[in-house]
Amino acid sequence: MGIIDKIKAIEEEMARTQKNKATEHHLGLLKGKLARYRQQLLADEAGSGGGGGSGFEVAKSGDARVVLIGYPSVGKSSLLGKITTTKSEIAHYAFTTLTSVPGVLKYQGAEIQIVDLPGIIYGASQGKGRGRQVVATARTADLVLMVLDATKSEHQRASLEKELENVGIRLNKEKPNIYYKKKETGGVKVTFTSPPKTNLTEQAIKMILRDYRIHNAEVLVRDDQCTIDDFIDVINEQHRNYVKCLYVYNKIDAVSLEEVDKLAREPNTVVMSCEMDLGLQDVVEEIWYQLNLSRVYTKKRGVRPVFDDPLVVRNNSTIGDLCHGIHRDFKDKFKYALVWGSSAKHSPQKCGLNHRIDDEDVVSLFAK
């Protein structure tokens, strides 16, 4: 029996099994097996070297990467053409984009790479179409922009979320608060900081570890709301990606005002119409907000700060991160920094490598 057949058999057994107290451990074991087989399927495909095709991979560049994911002909290519400095082939039929097309969104002094991926197809997690290559690129994103057709949004969103979930991409989720360490000896030790309120029991943890052939490990569950699914994610951590997702509903000109209002009120959501140029600026502003970037202006001694060419860093970055962004060896030569702005207690403040900088701070760096 091949891996795809095994996956199908487990999914069918899970569908047949009633969810209750008596079956929750059995279902948890099936979920663990399913996660293992899906990962094996993706690893086999990646190792086979097939399917990528010319131009599929795009080198990561700029201050952040955003990937556009959606079904064919939902308006991804149109959106890319409207907000970036590139052109993606556009047509009114499915599968126009056959390779990943990059563009650059210049906003607030930052250069944000936007990648229009081939239209993802239902069944990517079982090896259908080019979905596997699409999700492999999505794993490298700082933000997923899920573009949906407002006239078909409910079905599209649910199926895309399921596909991404199946291949280990977790949208708008935090890593489970579980400490897990594989050991050489000592057996399995499980500790809960408070009694679990879910199906994640000590027995379930030990059953799943046994199925993964892990006989020595330390597990500390710090959150009483963690589930079996969360624990499976923890032991498969190297194959899990926790990515922010912004849901963009296109073609709002084709639905009622009531429906537009309902969609717009959902969290992490923007509504727009590419054809009518409605809501495009809202999309750009929300991308900037979700990426949570900070601009830092540099200043040389005796010279005014450079305000038209900021260094862009992740929010909550330190002076050390800033130095590394300039050059990886710069930290070794670093002496001190002078900081003006909201992160400084007084202006200027003399700071070391661990000082956290805020958006629009001005920084002077001094070397030894």
UniProtKB/Swiss-Prot annotation:
Keyword Phosphoprotein: yes
More details: Present with 6200 molecules/cell in log phase SD medium.
GO MF: GTP binding; GTPase activity
Protein source organism: Saccharomyces cerevisiae (strain ATCC 204508 / S288c) (Baker's yeast)
Lineage, opening ranks: Eukaryota, Fungi, Dikarya, Ascomycota, Saccharomycotina
GO biological process: cytoplasmic translation; positive regulation of cellular response to amino acid starvation
Pfam families, per the entry: MMR_HSR1, MMR_HSR1_Xtn, TGS
GO cellular component: cytoplasm
Compartment(s) of residence: Cytoplasm
Domain TGS: from-to ranges: 292-367
Name of the coding gene: RBG2
Residue ranges constituting the OBG-type G domain according to the UniProt record: 64-292
Positions bound to GTP: 70-77, 116-120, 250-253
Full protein name: Ribosome-interacting GTPase 2
